[in-house]
Swiss-Prot record:
InterPro entries hit by this protein: DUF167 (IPR003746), YggU-like_sf (IPR036591)
HAMAP family linked: UPF0235
Pfam family, one: DUF167
Recorded family membership: Belongs to the UPF0235 family.
Entry GO CC: cytoplasm
Gene3D superfamilies: YggU-like (3.30.1200.10)
The name this protein goes by in its record: UPF0235 protein glr3835
Amino acid sequence: MRSPLPPMPDPEAFPPGAVSVDAGGITLTVWAQPRASCSEVVGWQQNAFKVRLAAPPVEGKANAECVALIAAFFGVPRRQVSLVQGQQGRHKKIRIEAPADLLLVALQKLS
């Protein structure tokens, strides 16, 4: 017998404007810090999900690493994660196509 899923967190529990939920998944506002000593999820910084990326912001390397890191954090394949805005800046919008309740539970662990 499977254990029941925890209740879906309210998207309003996260920083304002950081998480947008719809039927297909979530869109996450991300603040990326390239050329860090290692790639890692930091958590919430102001109104964004902060990640540190070891890759330099050259030829899309940091963007590719950002997508891979977020896919690994949420436990979804990379093909379900896409960069929808911010290809050339630190502020990004990342779309994750997966059941929103599971994604929000993962995000709640950072709060």
